[in-house]
């Protein structure tokens, strides 16, 4: 095992000369930050970052709170997610292998080589996300790295999981263990992110201080033959606004202290220093497109164009825009905005990096999936696949590869087929032939053979449609008048405090049991009363383990609009128990007024 060390200048220069002697396209990579974890009731029994409830009274915008009840859907099936844009394939679980496949194939088709998952420490939920992604990435020739948010380790998050790690010294010792874990399981192996023969990761901070990092790094041992990792250290100091012109920070003692440890200053989201004005009433601060370019110039001047041999991997940086109305600064109660400008902002960021492309080894994108901060490039309803096409356009220049856009739309078709086949299988249809075609299509997309992939997709769509025609479907509508409740309505209004049980008619329950497969939702109106700070819960009986997780059908809060709101909540077949034993179907629990409850199903045989 080789100790992790800071490369001396001479050794770094030699390694730099050796790695840059390879053909340019072999040494250049594109990675995208990956933000999670987002879940679904169907896959995980919870929602994760799709939901958000937070106070924002400190914001100067006048907005008092965030209330994104992601269990709620509208009449089109769109969930109330914590984001300003909606995923093109709908609200999915980051841990669903089909969704992971879709994202990886979409990224590959756009010229992206890997994801850097925002990661804090071993056994955190983001570590589970990392481990879920690795086998799919290995299957399709994709790389999985980390954007190490080591602040998570120094917050009390680690102490909640490991009470014995309760001092800064103990956290630094665990930092070393986490670093070794990354070396052994992320920075080496078939999915390791490697640029010019060197493993690389992004260090977001703001956790370890330089001395603590140096101590932890001194305890790490590298596998035999592994090159010293390149560490891209976030440098995103704020800058100032002078005479209506953004002026960036060009030097700071903090970044110098990290450079002394061999780290490479790398950009993150550009500063937003312009205060709210009449044209931007929804955000406390914003940036103009020109500000982004000014923000990037110090990286070009002091890192990209530098002959410093310690800069072994130089990374450009791009992002499409920002609108953090999904989170308001993660407790900071501050709304930020960078306009996408119809895709032009992303193009300008790429153009700035490409002007120095001969000096760059990689480009880092922020981000693939940060819906809450609103800088995702994953296809959305609002923006389509525009950002993926832009990524591919510049990836072709950067990596000297063909710009073949015919693969961009194929992963979404594959994902759609996966889900349709899944439903058919639940209805006891034999889907093996269709699934084999879908598998071949996915493999063809991963290898860049889009014509072959299209052929397999077309054949799979024909096979799936043929199976769908064999389904015998019928709808089942159950109005409130046919339901039984544990308490009577008062002037047409029912109260969920302390609880309200709802019972389906036996005939409906028998029909659901007899159906081979079904989809369904419960619809109701609730009075959006003054917030209490407490959640209202909707439970079912369930046999799915762990029951305390999968028994939750929905949880939500009121937002204080003083209006009646009509919503729908999905009833996940594998989660909700329907049987003939005595017991409720659903149970509302919390301070809530509701009315006009009804159930709606589509049954398949």
Provide a role label for each language-model segment.
Residues 523-531, 572-574:
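Solvent-exposed strand-to-loop "edge" motifs in beta-rich extracellular domains
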Residues 469-516, 530, 544-546:
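Glycan-recognition and processing domains
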Residues 8-18:
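Bacterial N-terminal signal peptides
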Residues 544-578:
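Extracellular carbohydrate recognition and processing domains
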Residues 589-605:
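Exposed low-complexity, polar/acidic, P/S/T/G-rich flexible segments that act as propeptides
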Residues 25-472, 570-574, 587-594:
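Glycan-processing catalytic domains of CAZymes
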Residues 530-542, 580-582:
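Beta-strand acidic-aromatic groove motif in beta-rich domains, primarily in extracellular
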Residues 514-523, 579:
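Extended extracellular/luminal ectodomain segments enriched in beta-structured repeat modules
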